[in-house]
Amino acid sequence: MARGVRLNGSWYCSRECLDAAARLSLAQPAGAPAGPAPLPPLRLGVLLRHQRVITGGQLQAALDEQRFSGLKLGTQLRALGMASSEAVLRALAVQSGVSYLSSLDLARVRGVCPLPVATVRALGLVPFDFDPFERRVSVAITAPLTRAAVRAMAMLTQWTVEPFLVDDPVWSVALSSYRPLESADGPAWAATAASARELADHVAAVAADGHPVTMRHAAYDQRTWVRLESSRETRDVIVRPEGDVACLVQPTAH
């Protein structure tokens, strides 16, 4: 840091000042609040009955069987042959207020979006359509919809994030097949775990050779997600609580 670093429009001449600024930024609220809690969604069984997919008797039989199997209701109905995968997925999408996809062309998740693989895996959102001009991305996600993950991605990237529900097997294959688009503005770095004390080191690295850095952060999964951007590169840093062990290669459970 012989020449200092410009972070979010301000100049910091020393490592100590940069560290203090990064910590102060993390202490600020991570964007707009989630807003008031929505009304509880209709239960899946009620929706399937309303859509005339199952009868009341079939629902009761599935609930009775569920007590022994421990399966989710949708999985139980499919196992009993009472509802198709698409019927269950459609009802789950209505329940969440989003669209759904019964299948996904794997070519759409390769080289389409610049998000790093580790960020995608940790958030559990698989990009399959990206418009850099409209700053809009479509992502595949499984039920139940994790709105906190969607908000975190939107806050980190400043993109409009449109979630689409898919079945668990479709999501798993899409996740393992995802490859990022190589950005013309520089490499998309995989997410890196760090403590709050180490964050300034990452800021200094992204700012190498005098490149100004923009820092944004979002709270998700009991951690703070930080995106550092310069004209040189983009880096995602997950600031974990003290004592937390870094594990960034496992997909988020849904």
Predicted features and spans:
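Short, low-order "capping/linker" segments at domain edges
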Residues: 173-190
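Extended, charged low-complexity segments
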Residues: 229-254
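Short metal-binding segments enriched for Cys and/or His
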Residues: 10-32
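Short linker/helix segments within small regulatory modules
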Residues: 1-11
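Short hydrophobic alpha-helical runs that function as membrane-insertion/retention elements
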Residues: 159-167
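Polyanionic, low-complexity intrinsically disordered segments
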Residues: 80-156, 192-226, 231-233
